[in-house]
Amino acid sequence: KERGIIVTNIPAYSTDSVAQMVFAHLLNIAQQVQHHSEEVHKGRWTNSPDFCFWDTPLIELAGKKIGLVGLGNTGMRTARIAISFGMEVYAFTSKSHFQLPPEIKKMELDELFAECDIVSLHCPLTEQTREMVNARRLSLMKPNAILINTGRGPLINEQDLADALNSGRIYAAGVDVLSQEPPRAYNPLLTARNCYITPHIAWASTAARQRLMQIALDNLKAYQAGNPINVVNK
């Protein structure tokens, strides 16, 4: 800024794709889609005495409490999808009650972890949020709780989460981000019970990547025209 250099960013290009991934993980866990598909291919449905077959709990999302940690673009889009599923939506956010739609209730962080059936992380990584999900907060959660992280890997203490999953302290986790990417072979989440990991692809739909490139081009053209947009160092 002191040297007159304009810095721009590319905002909100992957909002829909990341919110979609939250529910890809959540629906996979709720219905155990991957597991049951694998069991069908092994012949277990063929050998079932009944017209249907399942061997895990099947979870209905309607009426469940989802807690969103952070309510920016992606958090808000996730909230809207959750509302369409008939879920109760709570958020830990700097926004005031007056800034929230009536369907979203504000909650303090520890209360959110204790009261919600699903917790989804949407906050930036700062020194204050680093490893905010740790043994203490995991101990607050319900034994049937689900944790989703499409934000930043270091928001979670991975050993503490693995311990909570392996001990049955919480039911399941779906994560698209890890503290180190690609992960080391000894990352404890790779062998944790009911831990579903995708390789940082929430942002990477074709539509999102096309949008990213288009906004970058728009930023450049606007700068060349003397009317810069998406400036972050005004």
Each model region followed by its residue ranges:
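Short gly/ser/thr-rich secondary-structure transition/capping motifs
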Residues: 44-53, 98-106, 126-132, 152-155, ...
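Rossmann-like dinucleotide/phosphate-binding beta-alpha-beta segment
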Residues: 52-143
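An N-terminal-biased, well-structured beta-alpha scaffold segment characteristic
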Residues: 1-8, 114, 134
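Phosphate-binding beta-alpha-beta segment of Rossmann-like dinucleotide-binding domains, i.e.
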Residues: 12-65
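Rossmann-like dinucleotide-binding domain for NAD(H)/NADP(H)
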Residues: 8, 144-234
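Short loop/helix-cap segments at secondary-structure boundaries that form the rim of catalytic
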Residues: 1-2, 95-103, 183-191
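Short beta->alpha connector loops at strand-helix junctions that form conserved
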Residues: 4-16, 93
